[in-house]
Amino acid sequence: MSAARTASELALRIVQSLWLCGVRDIVLAPGSRSAPLALTLDAADRAGDVRLHVRVDERSAAFLALGLTTGSRRPVAVVTTSGTAVGNLLPAVMEAHHTGRRLVVVSADRPDRLRGTGANQTTQQAGLFGVFAECDDLTPEVSDAELDADVARACSRRGPTQLNVQLDGDLLPPDPDPAAWWHRPDDLEHRNDSAGAELRAEAESDPRSTSTGADPASASGVDVEPSVSISTDGEVLPLGPRTVVVAGDDAGPAARMLAEAAGWPMLAEPTSGARIGRQALRTGRLLLTTDLRGRIERVVVIGHPTLSRPVTSLISDPSLEVLAVRGRDGVATDPGRVARVLDVVPRVEAADDPTWFDSWHDADVRLSALIDAGLAAAQGDPQRAPGLDVGLSPLSVAAVVASAVEADTSLVVGSSNAVRDLDVMGSPWPPLQHRFVVGNRGLAGIDGTVSTAIGIALGRPRAARTIAYLGDLTFLHDSNGLLVGSGQPRPDLTFVVLNDDGGAIFSTLEQGDPRYSSAFERVFATPHGTDLAALCAAHHTAHERVEDLDRLARALAESPTGIRVLEVPVSRADRRAEAAWLRSLAQQALSRATGDAERS
């Protein structure tokens, strides 16, 4: 054990170690106990060595950090004071755990001797996150080697880590000159263990860390931090069984590579990173409600699919051969516990019979055309698309948003209906054109989406533009994310908020059965009547109410400065009928495709 450091000395050493491990963005929620860390970070930011983001709400701060690490692919730290401040980080820590994001929580704490004494703002916060984050409880006596190793492990771990820092004594540095609060470490060649050295090499070789380098994800269309393991030693799958590839959230290019090599249909969710090329189906989850579902013999699951019950039913079917590949968090998606789990993506040595893919592709093309034609007709005559009202359809809005996502665009998608509408209306994008489409799908919650989107936009400054597409409840749940203080980094970001005054997704579930209508509005739909324009004005955020699809398309083609909100009012009255309409179109599409095949 080393001699005890002052609080300022311990804070300096921690920030230096974070910097050595490639951390360049740090989010701070202010407080008294964390003062030594705050002053060190302010000085490091002024020196240009880190970019500091200050937020008054710890919950928002944590999701901002989550967005920053998702967008930049670097570890990001979030710093808080003691007490309930730490507890407010839990939702983002849970999401980071389930998505394998490198989120480093630096929680300031009282010294150990005050725990259990009733001292102000003192609780058992070391290990507060339980199974969701490993914890190192750092004392003023921690040795340089131990501290550096702890920080290096935190920055390299695929998932969140808590560094709980016991700060004792005087919380302010003796020298009031900010120049004395921060300096880069002097012994760069010898600090930190091998994990830290690897991270430093990674950061130094990353073209994004230079002013002239291009984002490798944008340049190649390949995720520089693969979510699943790709290896030439992957298991070789025999051809013959009628196979589909299910690409869930964060599947990455591996799913597309397998589907293309084998010639199999691929059901790729919008946030999969694999919804590219001919093998990807736009309406795959709808086609699972048709007879095509019964012809499937084998399923390969890559990533974390969460969007539909037909897909969950498919990958849980014990009568099928189901193969599930572990994700970056080490977990394979196998809700039915029927899959054979693989550590790496399997491979094939030849392409399969094309007639299997053709049957899916033909039905997908026909169903897509039927949906588009029905929506177009409903804009002028609702009788031509039964169940759909006149006015803006949420599906039509999703189509406009999808069309606005050009090459090198970042799109952040909220949970609930927004991502599901995009799943139906977003056609697969052409190969060799990268779109960065992400959402908080680890636990699929609506919380923190505004802050996450701001973090992603800040983490990907070279993106052509960043759009966030979300519902009104998702927006309101994290409206504190718009509270960006004066002088703080502020991205160019457009929010498209689909405002149907409540929770429309419940109308498509069991709760939406008309037999339960007496309680539905109050306990599920939860209409709020909030004036989003006034809310945005209070946060000095640009706002526009858009009631026309053409205007929405034009607005999304603009290049705004700063954050703006495009509010699109829609009705949720037809959501249940809309779901039934889509299922009926799927049956029509398969019947027509089958009839054409028989005639040919």
Model feature map: region roles:
Residues 1-6, 178, 189, 193-207, ...:
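Phosphate/pyrophosphate-binding active-site segments
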Residues 5, 132, 153-238:
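Conformationally flexible catalytic loops at phosphate/diphosphate-handling active centers
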Residues 6-79, 87, 425:
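N-terminal cofactor/phosphate-binding cores enriched in small/glycine residues
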Residues 11-15, 19-22, 32-38, 364-463, ...:
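Active-site diphosphate/adenylate-binding microenvironment
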Residues 14, 21-25, 70-80, 86, ...:
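Structural signature of the thiamine diphosphate
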Residues 66, 70, 81-82, 88, ...:
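Glycine-rich, anion-gripping cofactor-binding loops and their flanking helix/strand elements
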Residues 95-96, 102, 106-126, 424-600:
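Thiamine diphosphate
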Residues 96, 107-150, 268-377, 485:
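Glycine-rich, acidic loop regions that bind phosphate or pyrophosphate groups
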